[in-house]
Amino acid sequence: MRLAIINGEFKDKISIFDRGLAYGDGFFETTAWRFSKRKKDCRVEFWNRHLRRIKQTCQFLNIKISNFSQLEKDKKKILTKAHNIGMVEGVLKIIITRGEGGRGYKYEKNMKPNIMFIVSNKTEYPSDFYSNGVKIKISKSSITINNSLAGFKHLNRLDSVLARSEWEDHDVFDSMFIDNYNNIIEGTMSNLFFIKENVLHTPSINVCGIKGIMREVVIDKCSEFFDEIKICESSKDFFLEADSIFLTNSLIKILPVKQVESKKFVIDQRVLKIIKKFDDLKFLELK
């Protein structure tokens, strides 16, 4: 099941002249939503954090959205429709492009952005992924170094597309990028955390990678389980000496890792406690 709204209207086609198609000139957000029985409406997990990042990315890319309250209206409109046709939870993807324009990289001032909301079914991961962990690999593909774009979820995702084409093994959940300096960065679709001697480490996202919302949530709300949370460069060798590893994104939340290539890892009980936090609706900052 999929629904789409473009600029406030239910439709699923855009112009071939859209700069998002021609140049990747735009960005996207992906998050989860659910129907709240208590509130009697549909709510998005960590919505205010996603909305803040939308505003920050618009400012950085100089994409002019005149009225951000329209995003709230579009969100409500598409989720209400989704619930009316029987959905009680799912995935919400928001794509914002600079809009339609002529040839060439230079964009016109005051272009009208195209704002797309897409609702689709939630992917159900096996419960043993969360109790027993998943396998991951190290990518053979490089990740693009770009200090200016680091952290932003822009539409140029060919790094992940090429890396994801490297494996067909259904037992492998994701593949980790290594930069040109042999530092571990992130997965094709996830951020990365690892525990070493009671310290939680996550790679810095200063020259490449995405600063994911779930990465932010763990840093902000899970410090109680560790002596320290370090955001720093981490070599591949240092990472492979970790005591325990987990992945994050807005759909999987927290996913323990049991194996990297041929090396096996234990699942720290603190990771399981963090997973339990997501059962608390207040923790999800629903809005």
PLM regions: where:
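Ordered, amphipathic secondary-structure segments that act as subunit-interaction surfaces
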Residues: 79-96, 103
